[in-house]
Amino acid sequence: MAIITVTAQANEKNTRTVSTAKGDKKIISVPLFEKEKGSNVKVAYGSAFLPDFIQLGDTVTVSGRVQAKESGEYVNYNFVFPTVEKVFITNDNSSQSQAKQDLFGGSEPIEVNSEDLPF
């Protein structure tokens, strides 16, 4: 059994809303593999339900086993119990800055005798 992991951005093209017994849910369809340049192979897409906290524009990672299901003349590929996680991407391209805070609470330096030091 192979696990497929795909990262994609949820947008209007690859996300749709369906009505279920538990209310409206979003489904994302993502390509299961990349098409090679010049290849005539049709790319298979896998679908997975998105958690409610995922919004359009969010980048998500979908990971899980994919199961094929025939529906008439078509074959639908669905993730079975997938793990869907939101990928957090910062909007700035600057280097990561360190938090500047006084770890000692702004206290004054303490005078210590060299005789009291263990070294």
UniProtKB/Swiss-Prot annotation:
GO molecular function: single-stranded DNA binding
Induction: Expressed in the early phase of the viral replicative cycle.
Pfam (any one): Phage_SSB
Keyword DNA-binding included in the entry's annotation: yes
Quaternary structure and partners: Homodimer; two homodimers can further weakly assemble into a homotetramer.
Family as reported in the entry's similarity comment: Belongs to the skunalikevirus SSB protein family.
Function (record text): Binds ssDNA with nanomolar affinity but no sequence specificity.
UniProt-recorded name of the protein: SSB protein
